């Protein structure tokens, strides 16, 4: 052995990976430093400057509520938005993200009132604008907190200039939008039964309620027939209801001409109250036996009762003796079924939408019958009966009965009504029922339906162009892209079935309904007055409306101050958020209208998507968005709703502190986000494991590229294997771009992770490690591989950058220390020549044979006949001409990572290794012949052929000589 060989440490002659990019990520420590670096370097402004003049892409941010720390739903939502905007920015668009906040409304009022109570302060004694200032300050504080939390998630946007609904300009624009609606005749004051929160003392929209199971009283009530054909004289119609307190509001009974009804006679009675033997009652035939059982009666069927007979009936109110001395007609209603109850529906137009519709749709018929069609106001805003409920109102013995108290608990109304029905001998039966009932989503307390004067927007009024707000909205839905597609039908069904839009709320913290109205509800339309209002709001905010002397200031001297009343209700906060497109998309020069995308949770079909659609269609005739993307809710690992009581809440702050924001982001990217997702410790660990593999792939590339001198090898000079990798990059480029366009991030992450793990780490990198580590500096194969790995790195890191902004930034700066940020880069443009389907088809065959060889090697390893695949020199028997042809000219030993390999075109031995799915390939195992190379560890017969380096192969000896010459 020569002196050179004796002294040489071969490990120093290898091109082993070298990088400062650590295997251990340390994301919780590094990510905050990266956020600070981005802020210090002004990354957001650099992104805007780099995108100047490009086509705009706008994802309009649905505003979270400025109240409390962010939760996992916020994190999911913001990460999805961030990935979308980043992906468009890196594909040649100007994708500006402007975060926003919803600032008005009841939850903030509650917090301020809570603080008042703690200090013994009475809210009613506080000047309204002082109260509003405290609400404003509260919201501003939480905007600051949430901004920092969003930035910690890696969200990039204009946090220095967000939009807020309490900004003076925003308040002026919101008021201006209302005035547009008023000017077009779409705004009106009316009375309708609406959902009312007694606890919060305000009207609620459908979007502000959630449904919970409750147990309620249910009663069956007799309505004595007062006027009918002689054959039905002396009988009673029986209704069923789960809201006994609404009986004072009853004005009609609904039946259906599609239901079969019958007259029944009581044969026996075993009850303490209710019908007695001989009484005659009308029921839906299908439900009579069930009703009889509830009342402990036996019935005898007398005869059928036709719908024509029912339509001619007028009943007495069951509480007529208390002052309800008016006729109760029977009305044919489409909403009536014989699925439950009695087949008759108690109709209280003050307390239900269907009841209201049934009553108002029959006004002409009722008036022709001499029936008063005025709708009463039986319940006040505190849940007490009014004088419109004789026997239960303020003048009743014991005072006014109450439906619900200030804490959302059931009052005494049900029991007092039931006792009165028993006293009148008109209670048929009573019981308890568990059913779904609306609750306020804020207070979590039940709501009631009550008739109140409110401000509405017409859904079905003709708007002068042959359209209505409903028809415009439905047309707009048809022109909108929905992801998932099911969202279209969901929103369509809501618009088709919704009532007129209730805009008014009886609270203080919000944008006022800044109009003047007379006693009849007629709205003053005067452009000079409107201009004064909007000018004041722009300068002072909506507080100007509540300031002393506001009425005189805005009306001026042109109008009778006694005639015109200043409306002091505020707007539904959904109207606020429904107007964000005006003062964000239209008014900001860095945005555009309409937005390309609105993205929110699936509950926003009845919330922000809904209100934005209505507002924009009312004022502009189309939706403010081109596409609507929805995500589901985050459950725990068992699929249960996350709640503090279950102890299963996953806070994003905790995940970031323990694992890092990129882990949370990877979880979002790997879920079917449009459905409900699951999250917990095991799922987080799964994502940590996937992240580590991905990180190690990037780390290996960085280490290998430490030896890259930037040389780019011409495509024509590349070996087939490198061309195959570039073909796969070409295919992945389409998957990535199509995936980002379709908002299908799971498809992208699955494709990239599989590519990194299966095609790179377990195939291409494995095959090329020997070349990359051991070949001579001048080796074309080594240089070609480095050239391709450089392209792999650029593609993978930029493709992943929208999803994993922290990790990709770290990797990019490790590779390009002089670069500012990966996020200022663009996705690489892929040359058309990279796509090579014929080459892929050929290599599919090669890989098929390789699968059999690696399977055979695994058996040899398991049986401990070899330790490494380099100890093997298998014989591969192939009885398939296509497979054989594919291997022609290939260094198949290199591809299989063996020291040698022999390919034979025959059937092979019967006892050889084979796989069922590749039946015509048989592997016969043999050990490699020769000596193990001290440098590459391959076993070859030419070790010792070079006297200068007698313990290495000829290839390695040549490489060593070349390396020595370079020193």
From Swiss-Prot:
Binding site for ATP: 644
GO biological-process terms attached to the record: isoleucyl-tRNA aminoacylation
Catalytic activity: tRNA(Ile) + L-isoleucine + ATP = L-isoleucyl-tRNA(Ile) + AMP + diphosphate
Compartments reported by the entry: Cytoplasm
SUPFAM superfamilies from the UniProt entry: Anticodon-binding domain of a subclass of class I aminoacyl-tRNA synthetases, Nucleotidylyl transferase, ValRS/IleRS/LeuRS editing domain
Motif ('HIGH' region): 64-74
Residues the entry annotates as binding L-isoleucyl-5'-AMP: 600
GO cellular component: cytosol
Enzyme category, top tier: ligase
Pfam families, A to Z: Anticodon_1, tRNA-synt_1
Its EC number(s): 6.1.1.5
A GO molecular-function descriptor: isoleucine-tRNA ligase activity
Family: Belongs to the class-I aminoacyl-tRNA synthetase family. IleS type 1 subfamily.
The protein's name: Isoleucine--tRNA ligase
Primary gene name: ileS
């Amino acid at each position: 052995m020569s002196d050179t060989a004796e002294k040489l440490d071969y490990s120093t002659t290898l091109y082993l990976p070298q990088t400062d990019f650590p295997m251990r990520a340390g994301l919780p420590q590094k990510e905050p430093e990266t956020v600070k670096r981005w802020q210090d370097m002004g990354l957001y402004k650099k992104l805007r400057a780099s995108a100047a003049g490009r086509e705009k892409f706008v994802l309009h941010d649905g505003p979270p509520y400025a109240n409390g720390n962010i939760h996992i739903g916020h994190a999911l939502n913001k990460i999805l938005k961030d990935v979308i905007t980043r992906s468009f920015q890196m594909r040649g668009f100007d994708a500006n993200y402007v975060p926003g906040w919803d600032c008005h409304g009841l939850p903030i009022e509650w917090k301020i009132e809570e603080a008042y109570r703690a200090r013994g302060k009475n809210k009613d004694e506080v000047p309204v604008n002082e109260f509003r200032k405290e609400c404003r300050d509260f919201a501003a504080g939480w905007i600051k907190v949430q901004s920092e939390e969003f930035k910690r998630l890696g969200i990039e946007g204009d946090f220095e200039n967000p939009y807020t609904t309490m900004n003076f300009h925003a308040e002026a624009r919101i008021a201006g939008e209302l005035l547009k609606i008023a000017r077009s005749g779409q705004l009106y004051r009316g009375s309708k039964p609406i959902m009312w929160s007694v606890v919060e003392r305000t009207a609620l929209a459908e979007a502000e309620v959630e449904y919970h199971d409750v147990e309620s009283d249910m009663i069956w009530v007799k309505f004595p027939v007062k006027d009918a054909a002689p054959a039905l004289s002396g009988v009673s119609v029986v209704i069923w209801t789960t809201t006994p307190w609404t009986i004072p509001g009853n004005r009609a009974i609904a039946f259906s001409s599609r239901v079969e009804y019958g007259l029944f006679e009581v044969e026996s009675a075993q009850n303490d109250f209710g019908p007695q033997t001989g009484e005659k009652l009308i029921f839906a035939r299908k439900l009579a036996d069930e009703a009889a059982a509830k009342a402990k009666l036996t019935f005898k069927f007398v005869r059928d009762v036709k719908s024509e007979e029912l339509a001619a009936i007028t009943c007495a109110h069951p509480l007529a003796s208390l002052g309800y001395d008016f006729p109760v007609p029977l009305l044919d209603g489409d909403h009536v079924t014989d699925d439950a109850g009695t087949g008759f529906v108690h109709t209280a137009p003050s307390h239900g939408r269907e009841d209201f519709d049934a009553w108002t749709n029959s006004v002409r018929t009722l008036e022709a019958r001499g029936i008063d069609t005025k709708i009463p106001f039986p319940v006040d805003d505190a849940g007490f009966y009014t004088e419109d409920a004789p026997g239960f109102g303020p003048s009743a013995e014991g005072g006014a009965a109450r439906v619900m108290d200030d804490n959302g608990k059931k009052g005494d109304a049900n029991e007092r009504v039931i006792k009165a029905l028993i006293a009148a001998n008109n209670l048929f039966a009573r019981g308890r029922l568990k059913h779904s009932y609306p609750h306020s989503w804020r207070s979590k307390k039940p709501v009631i339906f009550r008739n109140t004067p409110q401000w509405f927007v017409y859904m079905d009024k003709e708007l002068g162009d042959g359209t209505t707000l409903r028809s415009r909205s439905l047309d707009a839905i048809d022109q909108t892209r929905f992801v998932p597609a099911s969202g279209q039908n969901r929103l369509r069904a809501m618009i088709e079935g919704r009532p007129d839009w209730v805009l008014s709320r009886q609270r203080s913290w919000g944008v006022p309904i800044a109009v003047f109205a007379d006693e009849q509800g007629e709205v003053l339309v005067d452009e000079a007055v409107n201009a004064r209002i909007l000018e004041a709001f722009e300068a002072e905010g909506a507080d100007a409306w509540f300031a002393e002397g506001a009425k005189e200031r805005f009306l001026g001297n042109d109008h009778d101050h006694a005639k015109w009343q200043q409306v002091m209700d505020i707007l539904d906060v959904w109207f606020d958020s429904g107007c964000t497109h005006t003062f964000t998309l239209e008014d900001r020069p860095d945005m555009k209208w309409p937005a390309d995308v609105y993205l929110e949770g699936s509950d926003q079909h009845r919330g922000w998507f809904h209100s934005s659609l209505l507002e924009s269609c009312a004022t502009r005739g189309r939706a403010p968005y081109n596409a609507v993307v929805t995500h589901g809710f985050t459950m725990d690992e068992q699929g249960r709703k996350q709640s503090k009581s279950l102890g299963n809440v996953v806070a994003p702050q905790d995940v970031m502190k323990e694992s890092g924001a990129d882990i949370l982001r990877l979880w979002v990217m790997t879920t079917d986000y449009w459905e409900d997702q699951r999250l917990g410790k095991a799922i987080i660990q799964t994502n940590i494991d996937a992240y580590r593999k991905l990180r190690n792939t990037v780390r290996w590339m960085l280490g290998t590229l430490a030896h890259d001198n930037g040389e780019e090898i011409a495509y024509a000079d590349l070996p087939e294997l490198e061309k195959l990798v570039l073909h796969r990059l070409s295919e992945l480029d389409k998957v990535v771009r199509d995936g980002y366009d379709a908002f299908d991030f799971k498809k992208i992450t699955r494709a990239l992770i599989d590519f990194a793990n299966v095609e790179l780490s377990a195939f291409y990198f494995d095959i090329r490690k020997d070349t990359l580590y051991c070949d001579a500096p001048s080796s074309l194969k080594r240089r070609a591989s480095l050239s391709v790995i450089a392209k792999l790195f650029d593609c993978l890191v930029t493709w992943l950058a929208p999803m994993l902004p922290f990790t990709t930034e770290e990797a990019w700066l490790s590779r390009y220390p002089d670069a500012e940020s990966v996020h200022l880069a663009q996705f690489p443009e892929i040359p058309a020549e990279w796509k090579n389907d014929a080459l892929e088809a050929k290599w599919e065959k090669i890989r098929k044979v390789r699968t059999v060889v690696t399977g055979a090697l695994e058996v040899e390893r398991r049986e401990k006949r070899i330790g490494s695949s380099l100890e093997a020199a298998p014989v591969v028997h192939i009885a398939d001409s296509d497979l054989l042809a594919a291997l022609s000219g290939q260094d198949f030993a290199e591809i299989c990572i063996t020291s040698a390999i022999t390919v034979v075109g025959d059937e092979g031995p019967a006892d050889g290794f084979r796989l069922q799915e590749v039946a015509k390939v048989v592997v016969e195992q043999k050990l490699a012949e020769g000596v193990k190379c001290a440098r590459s560890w391959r076993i070859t017969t030419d070790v010792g052929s070079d006297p200068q380096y007698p313990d290495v192969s000829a290839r390695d000896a040549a490489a060593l000589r070349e390396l020595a010459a370079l020193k």
